[in-house]
């Protein structure tokens, strides 16, 4: 039993093992019960035999008492007769014989007393043995009944435990199925949440970009309005100047020739500026080529992303295989969590660097806008350059989005690393490759920033040239102020001013058209923002619903965990009950063994009692032999006594015959002697008959 109990937790089917143990225990208890019944039957038979022997011994004892009383009566009668008889030598011999018979009688009497004491002791022993046997029999019968009741109770409990175990197995299977379905639902919800998070991130990026564009457009509008106000003020000033210039036309006509020379110089400078613009266009073409290279790298990144998705699918397949090794990987997850914390810190540092780069880009934009204020002549070309720069910024933002998506994918990869540590090395190599690619992208961003700095330097050079031109214009204006005398020149300058006024009005119309276009684009952007807000609200509602579903699933998981804990508690209770039942069975087996030991002791006692009975029988046989010897001695004594009586009769007869005559009157006195002589004969006849009956018995 101890071996079975120690090996029971290692075996796969404890219920079948417990059932087999219960069946074996029932069989063993039934066998023990049958053996006990057989032993009780044998013990009852033995007691019946002992009781029969006791009855026979009591009947023999009663008969011996009767014979002893008869012998005492005869001895007393013979003593009386001998005392009445006269004294003679034959009477002395008879007295000697009587004394010897009395001594033998005393010896026989002492033997009878000893036999009575032994018989009383045997009776007491038999009574004690009978009482102990009856008590043991009653105790054994009660014990057998208790064992039968316990066996029935154990059968009922075993059936109940089997039913409970079947119910528990069914509930466990159902709970496992529900857990699997819930795990699948949780995986689906997690995948959907990941997708929704990615979409939300993309929408947030788009929203941020649109907000930035709106802020830029609002700034442009404010700047344009300010420029319009400045142009209007300039127009007012120009009107005033025209009034002044009409007065000074005569003085300025003389200096028109000098201004024509200066205009030729300005044309040459304009050609130089066009050459610079050609160089800038070439630089823009080189930037386009670099953008094409970046697009190629982006396509390569997309291919890498596709490979990563395939690897993620393979990892999901590997996850199914790695669910069995989750318990082994929990220890390694802490180390990977630390590494992930370090990687997250590095990513935060990179994010701060990206923010700094964005701030630098914003500063570059502000500087470009300041340059756009100063460079009204090269505004269109610079606007094209700005559009290209914005395209590059969009591409940079796209690259940032790609980097963020790659970071999210890296997070997913790290989560997969938590679940499957065996593929960690491969994923780390891939992560290193992606980091190298990120480094290459960073280098490309640095090159783009360097190109932006070059463009800034070129713009600064252009600003310097513009300042030089402005200084020249100022010098020209000073010269024009000195040339107030030439009215003809002033009229030409008036025509030029009118031409500039027309161009300014054209610029105003173009700016107004641009403002209208910007307003329309603003409205479109507002509509897009409203639509995106609606989409974001829908996504938030979906997220709320998903969160509510997740909370419901969590509550279901908690309820299922509670039910599993209850089931485990029930299993533990059932195991405790089984253990207690096994302990009770062991105790009952120990009690059965104790009963067996008691039976062995009772058997030993019975054997000892049987030996004592055999000894008593031997003693009884010896006593019977002693009785036979005493009876023979009594027979010999009776025979001698009869001979003595016959001799006494002969002597009395001879004396009677010799004294017949004188003794006739005394016949009356002899009659009692005859009666006395006849009475012992009759007593002897009776004693002989009793001896014959005793021998026949």
Swiss-Prot record:
Q: Name one GO cellular component term.
A: cytoplasm
Give residue spans, biased composition: Basic and acidic residues: 670-684
Tissue specificity, please?
Answer: Predominantly expressed in testis, in spermatozoa (at protein level). Not detected in Leydig cells. The N-terminal 27-kDa fragment is also detected in liver, while the C-terminal 55-kDa fragment is also found retina, brain and kidney (at protein level).
Q: Where in the cell is it found?
A: Cytoplasm; Cytoplasm, Cytoskeleton, Microtubule organizing center, Centrosome, Centriole
Instruction: Write down the InterPro entries for this protein, in alphabetical order.
Output: Centriole_BasalBody_StrucProt (IPR051877)
Q: Which residues carry this modification: Phosphoserine?
A: 687
Q: What's the domain of life for this entry? A: Eukaryota
Signal sequence: where? Answer: none
Q: Where are the transmembrane segments?
A: none
List keywords of the entry alphabetically: Cytoplasm, Cytoskeleton, Phosphoprotein
Molecular function, one GO term: structural molecule activity
Q: Which family does it belong to?
A: Belongs to the CEP135/TSGA10 family.
Q: How does it assemble?
A: Interacts with HIF1A.
**Protein name, UniProt field:** Testis-specific gene 10 protein
């Amino acid at each position: 039993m101890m071996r079975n109990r120690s090996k029971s937790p290692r075996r796969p089917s404890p219920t079948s093992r417990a059932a087999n143990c219960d069946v074996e225990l029932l069989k063993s208890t039934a066998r023990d019960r049958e053996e006990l019944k057989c032993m009780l039957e044998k013990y009852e038979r033995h007691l019946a035999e002992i009781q029969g022997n006791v009855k026979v011994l009591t009947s023999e004892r009663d008969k011996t008492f009767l014979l002893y009383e008869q012998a005492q009566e005869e001895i007393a009668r013979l003593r009386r007769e001998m005392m009445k008889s006269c004294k003679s030598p034959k009477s002395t011999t008879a007295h000697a014989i009587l004394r010897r018979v009395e001594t033998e009688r005393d010896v026989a009497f002492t033997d009878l007393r000893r036999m009575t004491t032994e018989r009383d002791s045997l009776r007491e022993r038999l009574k004690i043995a009978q009482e102990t046997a009856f008590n043991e029999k009653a105790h054994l019968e009660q014990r057998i009944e208790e064992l039968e009741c316990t066996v029935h109770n154990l059968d009922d409990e075993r059936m109940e435990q089997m039913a409970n175990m079947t119910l528990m197995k069914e509930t466990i299977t159902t709970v496992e199925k529900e857990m699997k379905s819930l795990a699948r639902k949780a995986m689906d919800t997690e995948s959907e949440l990941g997708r929704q998070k990615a979409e939300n991130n993309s929408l947030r990026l788009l929203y941020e970009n649109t907000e930035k564009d709106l802020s830029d457009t609002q700034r442009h509008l404010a700047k344009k309005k300010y420029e319009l106000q400045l142009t209007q003020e300039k127009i007012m000033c120009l009107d005033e100047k025209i009034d002044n210039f009409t007065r000074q036309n005569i003085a300025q006509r003389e200096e028109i020739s000098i201004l024509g020379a200066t205009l030729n110089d300005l044309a040459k400078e304009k050609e130089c500026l066009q050459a610079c613009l050609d160089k800038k266009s070439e630089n823009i073409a080189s930037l386009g080529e670099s953008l094409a290279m970046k697009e190629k790298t982006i396509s390569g990144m997309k291919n890498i992303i596709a490979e990563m998705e395939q690897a993620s699918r393979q990892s999901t397949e590997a996850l199914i295989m790695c669910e069995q090794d989750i318990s082994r990987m929990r220890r390694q997850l802490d180390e990977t969590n630390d590494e992930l914390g370090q990687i997250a810190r590095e990513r935060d540092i990179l994010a701060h660097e990206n923010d700094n780069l964005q701030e630098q880009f914003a500063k570059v934009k502000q500087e470009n806008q300041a340059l756009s204020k100063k460079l009204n002549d090269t505004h269109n070309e610079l606007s094209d350059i700005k559009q290209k720069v914005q395209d590059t910024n969009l591409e940079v933002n796209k690259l940032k989005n790609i980097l963020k998506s790659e970071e999210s994918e890296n997070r997913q990869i790290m989560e997969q690393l938590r679940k499957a540590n065996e593929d960690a090395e491969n994923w780390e190599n891939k992560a290193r490759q992606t980091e190298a690619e990120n480094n290459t992208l960073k280098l490309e961003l640095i090159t783009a920033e360097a190109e932006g700095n070059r463009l800034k330097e070129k713009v600064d050079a252009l600003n310097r040239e513009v300042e030089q031109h402005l200084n020249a214009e100022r010098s020209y204006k000073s010269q024009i102020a000195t040339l107030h005398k030439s009215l003809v020149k002033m009229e030409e300058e008036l025509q030029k001013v009118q031409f500039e006024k027309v161009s300014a009005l054209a610029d105003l119309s173009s700016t107004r058209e641009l403002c209208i276009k910007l307003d329309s684009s603003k409205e479109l952007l507002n509509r897009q923002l409203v639509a995106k807000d609606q989409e974001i609200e829908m996504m938030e509602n979906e997220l709320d619903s998903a969160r509510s579903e997740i909370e419901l699933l969590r509550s279901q998981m908690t309820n299922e965990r509670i039910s599993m804990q209850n089931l485990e508690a029930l299993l533990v209770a059932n195991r405790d009950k089984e253990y207690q039942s096994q302990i009770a069975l062991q105790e009952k087996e120990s009690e059965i063994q104790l009963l067996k030991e008691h039976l062995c002791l009772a058997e030993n006692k019975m054997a000892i009692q049987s030996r004592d009975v055999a000894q008593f029988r031997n003693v009884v046989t010896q006593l019977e032999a002693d009785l036979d010897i005493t009876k023979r001695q009594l027979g010999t004594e009776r025979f001698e006594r009869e001979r003595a009586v016959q001799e006494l009769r002969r002597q009395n007869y001879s004396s009677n015959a010799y004294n017949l005559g004188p003794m006739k009157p005394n016949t009356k006195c002899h009659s009692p002697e005859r009666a006395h002589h006849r009475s012992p004969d009759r007593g002897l006849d009776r004693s002989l008959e009793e001896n014959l009956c005793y021998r026949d018995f």
